[in-house]
């Protein structure tokens, strides 16, 4: 989320009063009727209690009150995420994309249930898929390429406790 001292500039705009530019003699710039200000935040402006989003900045309640609509966005549905993954990594086979999406779903459930501390974002999934495709040029089969991609993009960055859980999920899905 934005730095509070920068967000202050937008308070008048969010209240429908236009932008006041004090450096230009107090000139007021009215917003176009179709103007919208959209903000995204992993922490809903509350800061980060988990330590996972260290750059998250808590926002004042006065600032948060100026945003009238809040939308929670979940991960894509498996079918849509599979299509997306195939779109960003076209060399990925349908079966492998489906297998990776199944793993991602299980990984995310484990995260939500508090079994692991490491989430799996679409960026992380894309990294695993890209690593798999590039590794396929170096190894003799898909199983070895997938194990390498999983290890280097997922396992190598997580805690030892998470590794145990994630390796179990991986083994169950990739029998």
Question: Which role fits each region the language model picked out?
Answer:
Residues 1-175:
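C-terminal regulatory/interaction module of P-loop NTP-utilizing enzymes
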